[in-house]
Amino acid sequence: MVKTQRVVITPGEPAGIGPDLVVQLAQREWPVELVVCADATLLTDRAAMLGLPLTLRPYSPNSPAQPQTAGTLTLLPVALRESVTAGQLAIENGHYVVETLARACDGCLNGEFAALITGPVHKGVINDAGIPFTGHTEFFEERSQAKKVVMMLATEELRVALATTHLPLRDIADAITPALLHEVIAILHHDLRTKFGIAEPRILVCGLNPHAGEGGHMGTEEIDTIIPVLDELRAQGMILNGPLPADTLFQPKYLDNADAVLAMYHDQGLPVLKYQGFGRGVNITLGLPFIRTSVDHGTALELAGRGEADVGSFITALNLAIKMIVNTQ
């Protein structure tokens, strides 16, 4: 890395394990400066509950970034709306969570930060606070005015991107249009090259229907939509294999010759990935004008403040973001 970079972290729901995980991240040295967008008392109280040392250093945007030393975090303060009891949601803090996300996103857009790593949020409490919120991905897409974003989850061994995300099953077939597939595959291909450093990405594409439609006998979306799009993109030089039946695609004979899988919908691709690497997975938002990674788990309210939360996914998300920073320099 040519110079030390700053990454911004949002711990997420303050009553959940996000603050615990951030405190655990601070127990080791990092080659980047970790700027945490959070309430100071929340972090120091949670560190005390966990019995872990933590020193908060003020964020100085006009000073050169410094590698983070063990036992420290750089604080970009955002005040809680209500005091926090570990494990107990407070509706007003839905506003606090969104404020941290907005500040972190804006800092990435204006060049303050080289990447954003997000902890788990509780969508219900944010909506209960009167803020329409469907997820990080959609929030950052809207705030950054990105034309289109793509959700991808990854472990060290497998990357799975989604053509559609949080849609009911009954709506998915209608959503799989030529325009959507062109856009999603273009973003996936571009970001695999620029953010992951893969010169010629090899992408496996799932069919939509069982047996990838069985030649039109189990649905015609493959024939009518998916195959024509793949043929057009192959003619442009992309390396695309598919559409393949999703129940056989996730085998070494296919995966060993691929850099990513494109699944048509959420529960087609993610169960395999989460079974293979739950707790070590990372959520990446492709198509944003900045790097964003996230943990692949929820708020786990019942574990907050108890010292039982596994920091593995957060470490993986941070390490991946650092690699992506290097690839984009």
Curated annotation (Swiss-Prot):
Keywords: Cobalt, Cytoplasm, Magnesium, Metal-binding, NAD, NADP, Oxidoreductase, Pyridoxine biosynthesis, Zinc. It is found in: Cytoplasm. Pfam families: PdxA (PF04166). Catalyzes the NAD(P)-dependent oxidation of 4-(phosphooxy)-L-threonine (HTP) into 2-amino-3-oxo-4-(phosphooxy)butyric acid which spontaneously decarboxylates to form 3-amino-2-oxopropyl phosphate (AHAP). Homodimer. Belongs to the PdxA family. This is 4-hydroxythreonine-4-phosphate dehydrogenase. It comes from Shigella boydii serotype 4 (strain Sb227).
